[in-house]
A protein has these predicted regions:
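N-terminal intrinsically disordered/low-complexity leader segments
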Residues: 1-14, 25
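Non-membrane alpha-helical structural segments and their capping/turn regions in soluble enzymes
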Residues: 13-20, 63, 67, 84-91, ...
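Helix-turn-helix
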Residues: 18, 26, 30-60, 64
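Short acidic/histidine-centered micro-motifs embedded in hydrophobic/aromatic stretches
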Residues: 43, 68, 96, 110-114
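Hydrophobic alpha-helical connector segments
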Residues: 64, 78-110
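Short, basic, alpha-helical segments at the C-terminal edge of helix-turn-helix-like DNA-binding modules
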Residues: 67-74
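Short secondary-structure transition hinges
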Residues: 102-127
């Protein structure tokens, strides 16, 4: 999953990782509409300029989290393709997918809003 972020957005610095982790937490707690770049920078005690250096817009943060989720889901399903079918495999797939969705629950809650406001995610999702 980090490999995809590296491919799309470049190498991940410690600050970049902290921003994404904080944004995910705040989006999950408060919803996308109530979290600004300032909220995120305040949460991790960095300047707004430092956050903007890594992510020009809030949508860039949402995109990074979206593609991180996509990669995590792809990894979950890749396990199925490489293995013999079994109840254990079905359990592991279900657990993994549910964990990914729970860890990024703001996408499920605010998905319509995200699709309406973010053309890059909409294009990827719709195909």
């Amino acid at each position: 999953m980090l490999a995809l972020i590296f491919f799309i957005f470049g190498p991940m610095s410690g600050t970049r990782y902290k921003i994404l982790r904080a944004a995910r937490l705040l989006f999950n707690e408060h919803g996308v509409a109530k979290v600004s770049q300032r909220t995120i920078s305040d949460h991790i005690a960095i300047s707004p300029g430092n956050l903007t250096y890594h992510f020009k817009k809030r949508d860039d943060i949402i995109e990074a989290l979206y593609f991180d989720l996509v990669e995590a889901m792809n990894e979950s399903f890749a396990l199925v393709e490489k293995s013999e079918p079994s109840f254990e495999l079905l359990y592991e797939l279900t657990r993994s997918v549910n964990k990914n969705l729970f860890d990024n629950r703001f996408f499920m809650i605010d998905f319509i809003q995200i699709l309406r406001s973010n053309d890059k995610i909409k294009k990827h999702y719709v195909g």
